[in-house]
UniProtKB/Swiss-Prot annotation:
GO terms for molecular function: ATP binding; protein serine kinase activity; protein serine/threonine kinase activity. It catalyses: L-seryl-[protein] + ATP = O-phospho-L-seryl-[protein] + ADP + H(+); L-threonyl-[protein] + ATP = O-phospho-L-threonyl-[protein] + ADP + H(+). Residues 450-461 have a biased composition (Low complexity). Keywords: ATP-binding, Coiled coil, Cytoplasm, Kinase, Nucleotide-binding, Phosphoprotein, Serine/threonine-protein kinase, Transferase. It is found in: Cytoplasm. Residues 407-508 form the AGC-kinase C-terminal domain. This is Probable serine/threonine-protein kinase ndrA.
Amino acid sequence: MINDHESVIDVGSDDERENFEDEEDTTTVYSSDPLSRPTMDRSLAAKMYIEQYYINAQQSVKERGQRRKDLELKLENMKLSSKESNDLRKELDKKESDYMRIKRLKLKRSDFEVIRIIGRGAFGEVSLVRHRESNDLYAMKRLKKSEMLKKEQAAHVRAERDVLASANTNWVVKLYYSFQDDNYLYLIMEYLPGGDMMSLLIKYDIFTENQARFYIAETILAIESVHTLGYIHRDIKPDNLLLDSKGHVKLCDLGLCTGFHRLHSSEFYQMLVGDAMTIKMKLIEATPLTQTERIASWKKARRALAYSAVGTPDYTAPEVFLQIGYNKEVDWWSLGVILYEMVVGHPPFLSDNTTETCLKILNCKETLQIPTDMGLSKEVIDLIKRLVCEKDRYKSADEIKLHPFFKGVNWDNIRNQSAPFVPELKSPTDTSNFDIYEEIPNDIDDDDNNNNNNSNNNINLNDNINSNCTYTTPTKKSNIMGKGNIKDKDLAFIGFTFKGFDAVNKSPTNRRNVESIFNTNNSTTTSTTK
């Protein structure tokens, strides 16, 4: 399988890199102390830039060679004429040249027209956008740098960018570009018009077991693809299961950017655990609402809670709360909770507040109750119990696939089957499967205006060195080796910029081409770890 994503971080065009050459020094004179903060910051930024540059150069050569090797292996197994084979080789060569040009482009927010906001959370928003030059549609995730740092999210957003950049699978949302400006980080991803699984659950309330089987099977393959990359998702929930135009599942939010991490304090949860009797008493006392009232209240606030800074703990495994050491099994716990919600109509540990939910999860052996009056099959009940448990939980996708609940599932071809619910789309820009959000006045171009207003004082080198380093200078462009101060938030996001090889495959074609050859089996979970 070809490696569709090339983890090459844009280091700017040739003329931009000339900024590193010596220039006439017209900058403000600072302390000559070699250990001063500005000197240390510039040294660190230069070191990070140089290291990243050579890592990328080496990786670029390696991945380009791998794409050629993959093509030749595919051609060996296809009965093509010599002319057809040579045409495909020439097409790959052209794509490689196009990709080199794409990597030299400097992207900015004004390159994209915002059509509509389709999601908003504590740290930013997601919009359907159109690239002004190519007219291609994307989902643009915009995150505020200051909030990322204040809420200690820098590592999480970088993790999401790294996983998306390295993912070569149809089970994870594609990342085409990432870039930044003075105030924001941007992830330019494929637009999936089907909405998310949470919207389906809100709309239909309860799935049949056949419907649940299909979506859980696809979610297993999606989680497996992330595990194959060497990652644990840790935030599997209906909000993070997106649906494409045909209703098939793709994973998103791979960085815990809106997850429940702010409450992941071992001291906090150890305090909640206490002794077993204390917890039982708290659970007995903390029940002011009836179950019917509790479910109704939860459904009403479902979407707002998903986009809050705290998030929801409903799908989180107990070992994540306690931070006592956990592995891939935490994602299978979340899968079991989602299955329960699909066939019952609400999560298994639904409570009046997050503290009570956490207490129930930590005592899942006693608090997990599966309704006996809903006609659920013994297979689905057993699968839930094998996933939502502290001990003897399933450890791998292969184990789960063998469960009787999945009898008859065609794992190798499921993505080519019809989904239970296929989105009804009136146009490529249809956003009817997303909630409606109001535009924030004067927000669309604030980054570009800010850059223009500060152009005489702060020189933005974020696309030149994959950061957003600014340097004080009275009249002319500076460079990373010059005088000035580097902001703390700038150092945190050096290396964020990315341009993926998939960007050259955006324009569809009906004839046999390189992209179609490398995607002859869309149901596979093959992926390459960077």
